Amino acid sequence: MKQVVAASLLSLAAAVAASAAHAATPEELAKSKNCMACHATATKLVGPAYKDVAAKYKGQKDAEDKLVQKVMKGGAGVWGPVPMPPNAVSDAEAHTLVKWILAQK
């Protein structure tokens, strides 16, 4: 019985690791975290297009840290009346996403 439980736990751990590793690119990470349900790279959907976010924050030294907080905690009032909810991402994932967003042209 202990071997069955141990094997089940190992399988679960492997599945979790595989799903985390599945997002090999920032765009895949954005898709897996459902960012693309409200955002697109070039067109406004519910939220702003990522290229517009990059243009707005271009040259701002604190842009990455500011946007990481918005991604993690949510926010409102910057892009219109629809608030962005907080997102279930790690600090590292938020930084990866924001660096990718700020690189859009």
Q: What is each stretch, according to the model?
A:
Residues 24-41:
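Sequence/structural segment immediately N-terminal to covalent heme-attachment motifs in c-type
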